[in-house]
From Swiss-Prot:
It is found in: Plastid, Chloroplast inner membrane. One of its GO terms (biological process) is potassium ion transport. The keyword Chloroplast applies. Keywords: Antiport, Chloroplast, Hydrogen ion transport, Ion transport, Membrane, Plastid, Plastid inner membrane, Potassium, Potassium transport, Transmembrane, Transmembrane helix, Transport. This is Potassium/proton antiporter CemA. It comes from Zygnema circumcarinatum (Green alga). The chain crosses the membrane at residues 235-255, 328-348, 378-398, 414-434. It catalyses: K(+)(in) + H(+)(out) = K(+)(out) + H(+)(in). Contributes to K(+)/H(+) antiport activity by supporting proton efflux to control proton extrusion and homeostasis in chloroplasts in a light-dependent manner to modulate photosynthesis. Prevents excessive induction of non-photochemical quenching (NPQ) under continuous-light conditions. Indirectly promotes efficient inorganic carbon uptake into chloroplasts. The keyword Manganese does not apply.
Length: 453
């Protein structure tokens, strides 16, 4: 068996897969080294071109090109370093295992000739290095890559402060936040002022056409719209899925075992609240009545009271188990809801700039529609929330929410909510139409009232 393993190791060592496997760290480091050379060349050429007069005219286009090259080079450098470290770690562990195995065979007393001819000490030590690559060369390349990364950060700072900010601030009144934790560090959003943006944009475009700068602002406008849409979609996806995923993972891994152990061992009660106990009593009465009805219909005279009591006892134990699990589920629902709300609040608090971008993007989509479509969507939303048939929907929502937190259906609570909450929504909507929409676009208000009538 040992000779068979040695033969397999000899064949693996002489195969092309083995050479490819041992050369993986060197290939990864070489890719990162080539990408760092590209960054250093861009840094040298950027300093040379910046002093030319043509840079003032084509500076923004040059910055766009530099950004694309830097993004690609940065990805290659970081991915190559990650692959280098991971493969180096795996190869080190693997070579240590092979060296221990070879050393154990060398110290055997029988003197295995097959092993002595194929695996000597010098060949075993070769497994601890990276395919004839010295540490001095590796350290020199790593130092070069580190210097290239420093140049890359300097290039990003220089290219981000040249032409896009003054153009957009002067022509479109756009703010560019520079510290967003996203795929792009420069995500733009437009501020909303008292004057409608359609008027300011029309005036800005007129000035741009007169000054002959229409070509130079097409790319900034496209880049602004692209970053705005990308950041808004990412933020909306995070707001929807991240709290749900985080609370579900916490529920499965941590909360469910802890709550089940606590409720089954530390608590003597079965019911979470009084409504569960009342529902269990009503269910038990129904089961007992159905059992007596079956006995009367079947006309079984030999049915003893002890058998009836035993069946009722078994049904009671089943109900206890059902409501015990329901109590655990209710506690889990409350905890997961609290975790989801906390996660959502953290996202809204830490992502204020993203929220401003998302708000601006939604307003851009809304104001880009025609007046008829705007009035249609407003009518659709109001009819769903405060329309004639909306109380039935609110009753279903409140009933499901009460069942979710472990309470029974209470018609007084539902009636109180349905009679007050839609009225508050109607008041807020009318205030928004009167105060904001009437000032921004009076034609929408006229179309809305016409369609509503």
């Amino acid at each position: 068996m040992c000779c068979y393993l040695n033969l397999l190791m000899i064949q693996f060592e002489s195969s092309h897969i083995c050479h490819w496997f041992w050369n993986t760290p060197y290939r990864a480091l070489q890719r990162a080294y080539k990408a760092s050379k590209k960054v250093r060349n861009i840094h040298t050429n950027y300093i040379f071109c910046k002093s030319k007069p043509a840079f003032q005219r084509f500076g923004y286009n040059l910055d766009l090109y530099i950004d694309s090259i830097l993004d690609e080079s940065s990805f290659q450098i970081y991915w190559g370093l990650l692959e280098f470290k991971a493969s180096r770690f795996v190869l080190t562990k693997f070579s240590n295992l092979i060296f221990k195995h070879n050393f154990h065979l060398l110290t055997q007393t029988d003197g295995n000739k097959l092993f002595s001819n194929s695996f000597d000490r010098e060949q075993s030590l070769l497994f601890c290095d990276i395919h004839s690559t010295s540490l001095k060369i590796i350290n020199r390349k790593l130092a070069w890559i580190e210097a290239a990364l420093a140049d890359l950060e300097m290039l990003r700072d220089n290219s981000s402060s040249t032409s896009i900010t003054p153009i957009l601030n002067k022509v479109y009144n756009v703010s560019l936040p520079m510290s967003l934790d996203s795929t792009s560090k420069r995500v733009a959003y437009e501020s909303v002022g008292l004057v409608p943006r359609s008027i300011t944009r029309t005036f800005a475009r007129f000035q741009t056409e007169l000054a002959g700068r229409s070509v130079s602002v097409v790319l900034p406008e496209f880049r602004l719209a692209k970053y705005q849409a990308t950041a808004s979609v990412q933020y909306m996806a995070c707001l929807i899925f991240l709290p749900w995923v985080f609370s579900t993972i916490c529920k499965i891994i941590f909360l469910q075992p802890l709550v089940s152990h606590y409720w089954d061992t530390m608590q003597t009660q079965v019911f979470f609240n009084a409504s569960q106990e009342q529902r269990a009593l009503r269910r038990l009465q129904q089961i007992e009545e159905l059992l007596w009805l079956d006995i009367v219909i079947a006309s079984v005279p030999n049915k003893h009271l002890q058998d009836i009591a035993g069946e009722i006892h078994n049904k009671t134990l089943e109900l206890v188990d059902i409501y015990n699990r329901e109590s655990i589920c209710t506690i889990l629902n409350l905890l997961t809801d609290w975790i989801s709300i906390t996660c959502l609040a953290c996202l809204l608090t830490w992502g204020k700039k993203r929220l401003a971008i998302f708000n601006s993007w939604i307003q851009e989509l809304f104001y880009s529609l025609s007046d008829t479509m705007k009035a249609f969507f407003i009518l659709l939303l109001t009819d769903l929330c405060i329309g004639f048939h909306s109380p039935h929907g609110w009753e279903i929502i409140i009933t499901l929410f009460l069942e979710h937190i472990g309470f029974a259906h209470n018609k007084y609570v539902v009636s109180c909510f349905v009679s007050t909450f839609p009225v508050i929504l109607d008041t807020v909507l009318k205030y928004w139409i009167f105060r904001h929409l009437n000032r921004i676009s009076p034609s929408i208000v006229v179309t809305y009232h016409t369609m509503n009538e």
